[in-house]
Swiss-Prot record:
Enzyme class: lyase
Amino-acid biosynthesis found in the keyword field: yes
Species of the source: Staphylococcus haemolyticus (strain JCSC1435)
NCBIfam families: CysBLyMetC_Staph
InterPro entries for this protein: Cys/Met-Metab_PyrdxlP-dep_enz, Cys_met_metab_PP, PyrdxlP-dep_Trfase, PyrdxlP-dep_Trfase_major, PyrdxlP-dep_Trfase_small, Trans-sulfuration_enzyme
Assembly, per entry: Homotetramer.
Cofactor requirement: pyridoxal 5'-phosphate
Name this polypeptide is given: Cystathionine beta-lyase MetC
Amino acid sequence: MSLSKETEVIFDEHRGVDYDSANPPLYDSSTFHQKVLGGNAKFDYARSGNPNRQLLEEKLAKLEGGQYAFAYASGIAAISAVLLTLKANDHVILPDDVYGGTFRLTEQILNRFDIQFTTVNATQPKEIERAIQPNTKLIYVETPSNPCFKITDIRAVAAIAKRHHLLLAVDNTFMTPLGQSPLALGADIVVHSATKFLGGHSDIIAGAAITNRKDVADALYLLQNGTGTALSAHDSWTLAKHLKTLPVRFKQSTSNAEKLVAFLKEREEIAEVYYPGNSSLHLSQANSGGAVIGFRLKDETKTQDFVDALTLPLVSVSLGGVETILSHPATMSHAAVPEDVRNERGITFGLFRLSVGLEQPQELIADLNYALKEAFNESIIESITEQRFSS
């Protein structure tokens, strides 16, 4: 029977075979008994394999429509694994507004190993193709990008990659496997910061890489095992449980985000609102606008005043939790990017990223409304309580 993704995250094919409990047991063990010396047992040492991680990886593979999945100790560990499948003098093409952690990884760490990187405007497939060199091996994109929500045409870039015999990796963190399926669009590898929507509760750090290619899978497993970056049994067990509620969480957060987008578009204090659901290209390759919004204040000198006046959002790094999280990319996710480069890429001091959670949307709107008025010195007539939380 072919199952929907919504059912797949709940159904456990090991139940009734390996155990009878509603949830799989936690195999909190570093090592496993070997009945036969040299007998090639399924599990021997937890870094190499664990039943909880195996179950999680099976679910992640099915969600992304892949044959192989690998769970890592963080999103950046998964990205590192993908890039470390390359060797010295190989060349990679990246978006010019790539996530700050990926920027730091490429600029300060991997360049020591003579892996070469070129950044381009990934919204223009022709620019990507022009950047290809004889030693290019990989095109790596984020779509939507973080934090300016630029959209890359996955089908077009996949066609370029195949024409030049290159690999294409797509960071699908913002959209989740429920909102976008890069492998089905022609990508070779999908990566996630599973800390975000897949985990959804801001209580674990995790990453994932999924592929249909056996050669890539072998390389990813070698790195997972050989560099010791595998996700722990406990975090694998926790993440597998959290995946069960991903469909309802992502659907509700997206619905809430759409309401906040409509509100922010009407505010005169806001210079720009960024939302993937406003892009026809995005909607041609995804079935959802997602639950993350970008917006820019008209007067960036009001940035701290705006933050000070907010009550409901968690002001923090990260995204994809059940709680609404307001992030300031210039001082958080992209702090590792030099200021002049940030400004050139539109990551200015007045830019915010809002990951919308499961709170009542009208209460979030009321809180944002109050904070904008307070920051921009508009008169407050109603009491704070009434203005923030009246329906």
